[in-house]
Amino acid sequence: MIAEAGLAALWLAAALAFLQLGLVWFGLTTDKPELLASVRPVAVAQGVLTALSFALLVTLFLRSDMSVALVATNSHSAKPWLYKFAGTWGNHEGSMLLWVMVMGIAGMAVALFERALRRDTHMATLGAQAMISLGFYAFLLFSSNPFARANPAPPDGQGLNPLLQDPGLAFHPPTLYLGYVGLSVAFSFAVGALLTRNVDAVFARAMRPWILAAWILLTLGITAGSYWAYYELGWGGWWFWDPVENASLMPWLAATALLHSVTVLATRDALRAWTIMLAVVAFSMSMVGTFLVRSGILTSVHAFAVDPERGTFILGLLALYIGGALALFGWRIGTVREGAQFELVSRETMLVVNNLLLSVILGLVLIGTLYPLMTEAFGHKVSVGPPYFDRIAGPVALAVVIAMAAGPLTRWRKDQARAVAGRLLVPAIVLLLAFAVVSVLAWGRIGVLPFLGLVIAAGVAVGSVAPLWKRNLRRTPLFTYGMVIAHLGCAVSLAGMAADSAFTVEKLVAARPGDVIETAGWKVRFDAITPIAGDNWTALQGDMTASRGSGSPIDIHPQARFFTAPPTNTTEAALLTRWDGQLYVVLGQEADDGRWQVRIWWKPFVTLIWLGGMMIALGGTLSLLGRERRGYKSCGVVLRWRPHEPLGDLVAAGVVSGLFRVVRERAVEA
């Protein structure tokens, strides 16, 4: 009965989405925006029903109910509870239900908490969100039913892919889906604004928190996924330019451009049409990623579906949503008047340059991702790998980082080139010093891109904190700290990428217990092989010690694991982290002569890559807390920022509109 209840909740949510769409259409065509009061409870009920449906699927996985086909093919009765829980979305159908649930809850949040938009724009936004949700409901119910029964029911189940049996599964996919859905909400805002001819700064301020939240979540998801692949797959790399990796990167690039564009629109009332177009592009990249993962055209640890009919369904949704949005854009573009103008030397111009460069990178990654698939469709196999992306997209990415550092040092509207050059003097000096230092230490021993990466990272790090110079730090707004930390995080990640590419040392040996392996100043002693067992796996563990210089030996334990359900051999790398890098050890197979394959990497400063990613997400979070709308009104309580006050100073108003007006007047006077 649990499965039937979950399916019924899903059908009812789909019916409510259809009702929501109908109410919005009727309200807009009859000019009755007051129908928004009727749309809100429908959106709320839809969110509750999708959450209920997903909770029931989680219950089926935790109970190991093998009478449900999805549980039988993606779980096992002997699996630890964490992987039963996370395994709910470690498959095509479950992950799509998670997607639909997040979309339903997002629609509920827009219905309940959005108060800045005009009522007709708000209603049109909810209609667009209902339209998107309806398509995914149809996809789930007609081609990917997560509650289908297994007949006959197996006793234990087939088990989850061992590569997915990692705590990363509990964090990486959900954060990506949350980010994708956030972009769908931004898309709905854009469609709603076009339908009601309401593209202005107020609309941008309403949309910006969703874009920022989606961008933060995508940043966290990509960072977590990169580290998960790094330590789980045992190949020593953190990004392979896999098509499905690119499928998450492309929405992030579009969201980054959109975030900067909507900031210009929200604060300076410029770039109206460009912001709408970027909102469409960002969501379209999410849909492209969905198609790549679920169409069956890719074979990857990331890919779910092998049914081309599902890919056709998603392709139809992509054509409907994006084609419809572009048609609407072309129809309404004449009504979208550009707002305030700005001079060539201005922060707005720097943000436009940032947008254009990010768009170039997005286009290059999209071409490199889709070109092999298109040529294969015509019978020709072409491989596009890291050399293409590194050599083509890498230099543009470095230019983006430079523009990112210069932008905050330029004034809004109009500035003087000489004044901007003066503010960039210190970062430029640091960049030249870094050039000299790296040249002395590594000239001729590293590639051009890593060399430039190290040099630019130093200059950008200084440029990122430059907005704090000569400021009263106690009175600096929280969103400024967020911007500084996020930009500094980009420099930190760039330094980690460049150092890893330039200075990584790799050694592959065949060793017996008792052997000592020396590489990059480390001594790794291979002591013994010990059989061990886990909840649903057995392993041969390499007992080793690692030491450097006069330091004490440290135990490390790489493993060669075997999972019985399904039967799979995997490796578990041993990682030893130090301030200046990470020792990465992988135990391979045993040869006939009793020697074991051991692969060792010393990867200087590689952890800066993920530290920088977390700093970027932290900076985005501070900006979200400190800047968005500078006030929050919900349940009759109003909180507003006073722009001139110290960081974190809030002025709280009461529940009556009179107090709200007082606070608003104080902010204006300030």
Per-region residue spans from a language model:
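Conserved active-site neighborhood of enzyme catalytic/cofactor-binding cores
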Residues: 213, 223-230, 236-237, 243-288, ...
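Membrane-interfacial loop-to-helix junctions in multi-pass inner-membrane proteins
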Residues: 29-51, 112-134, 195-216, 241, ...
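Transmembrane-helix bundle segments that line or gate the permeation/cavity pathway
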Residues: 53-72, 93-100, 104-107, 141-148, ...
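Soluble non-transmembrane domains of integral membrane proteins
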Residues: 508-599
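Contiguous transmembrane helix-bundle modules in multi-pass membrane proteins
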Residues: 1-34, 45, 52, 66, ...
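Membrane-interface interhelical loops and short amphipathic "cap" helices
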Residues: 1-9, 32-37, 59-93, 145-173, ...
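A conserved hydrophobic secondary-structure block that centers on an alpha-helix together
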Residues: 11-17, 21, 95-226, 234
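Extended, highly charged clamp/arch subdomains and adjacent linkers
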Residues: 2-85, 93-123, 135-146
